[in-house]
Every structure is written in C-alpha cells, then in structure tokens.
C-alpha cells in the first residue's frame, strides 16, 4: 500500500481522477515487457453464457448485470491477448467484493475457452497488491478445475515478466 501510494500516486489519494493510475502502470509494464502497444478495449464477457462482445454501455441493456467489466487491454500478435489489470490493497468490504467479482470474471474466462476450443484468445490476468497476493491461491486453485489453464495467466506483474513468453 505504501509503495503504491508513494510510487504511483506521488503521495496523493488514489481516487477520482487518479483511480486509473495503477491500471496505467500495469499497462506500461506490459508494454515494456512485451514490446507491444496494449490497446484499450470494450470487450466484455457475459457471465451467464460465457459469450463475448464489444459493449461500451451494458447499463443500457436489459441484461446489464450479466456482463463483466471490460478487458483492460488487448495485444494482437499471432494470438489475441486480452488483459485484465487489478491492484487490490488493504482489507475490507470493498476489497472483498472486488476479489469476488474478479473470481467470477476469471472463472467465466475458463468457460469461454472451454466453449470455444478453436479460439486464438489467451487471457492474461495481472493481479497486484497485498490483498490480491493473499488470495492468489484461490485463483490458482481455480486453474486446476479446467483443462484450459494453459491459455490463462493468473499472477502478478513480476511473475508475468518472468513467464510471458510461455503464453
């Protein structure tokens, strides 16, 4: 928490206008690691049926609550890489809700791959912060439930830097 406060926000509260600071830092790290531009995207997963579509405003739809947050980034090379960035620090109800929503989002990624075995999509979930680190084992356990685990990365920025070429 202190590192994020000092390094990413220059000592300022990270809310409002600076709430994207952590995501922007993670995006920059991915671009430095891969040497590729990580473009923003409006792609979302439907949490009920594991379909995917470009959707900028799910709140205008009757099924608005069935849609995930959008993926934070996309890199297309030989495969299509969809990135999800999270930095969760501290403890409390907000952090617990974020982690729970994230769990269902990542679980849906596995179902999407299972339902679309010929897709060239690889999901990259970069999860930083002390709260994420403490719960990362729950997400690793999730990988053991699906044979599609080789097409989903779950880990922090440092682990991604070490292993990104495997994906």
Write out the residue ranges for each language-model feature.
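Charged, often glycine-rich, active-site loop that binds/positions anionic groups
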Residues: 46-65
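Hydrophobic, Leu/Ile/Phe/Ala-enriched alpha-helical segments that form helix-helix packing faces
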Residues: 25-37, 105-113, 143-146, 164
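Conserved aromatic-histidine-acidic binding/catalytic patches
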Residues: 10-18, 65, 90-94
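Interdomain/boundary linker segments immediately adjacent to catalytic/signaling cores
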Residues: 1-44
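Active-site beta-strand-loop-beta-strand hairpin of nuclease catalytic cores
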Residues: 67-82
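Domain-level recognition of nuclease-like catalytic cores that cleave nucleotide substrates
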Residues: 119-167
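Short glycine/proline-rich turn/loop motifs
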Residues: 7, 83-89
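Catalytic cores of nucleic-acid endonucleases
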Residues: 87-134
């Amino acid at each position: 928490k202190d590192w994020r406060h000092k390094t990413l926000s220059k000592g300022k509260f990270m809310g409002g206008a600076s709430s994207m600071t952590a995501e922007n830092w993670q995006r920059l790290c991915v671009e430095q690691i891969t040497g590729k531009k990580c473009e923003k995207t409006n792609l979302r997963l439907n949490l009920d049926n594991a379909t995917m579509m470009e959707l900028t405003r799910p709140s205008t739809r009757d099924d608005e609550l069935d849609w995930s947050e959008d993926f934070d980034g996309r890199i297309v090379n030989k495969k299509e890489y969809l990135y999800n960035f999270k930095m969760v620090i501290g403890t409390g109800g907000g952090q617990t809700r974020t982690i729970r929503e994230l769990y269902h989002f990542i679980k849906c990624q596995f179902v999407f791959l299972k339902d679309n075995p010929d897709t060239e999509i690889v999901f990259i979930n970069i999860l930083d912060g002390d709260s994420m680190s403490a719960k990362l084992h729950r997400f690793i356990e999730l990988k053991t439930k699906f044979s599609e685990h080789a097409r989903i990365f779950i880990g922090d920025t440092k682990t991604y830097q070490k292993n990104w070429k495997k994906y």
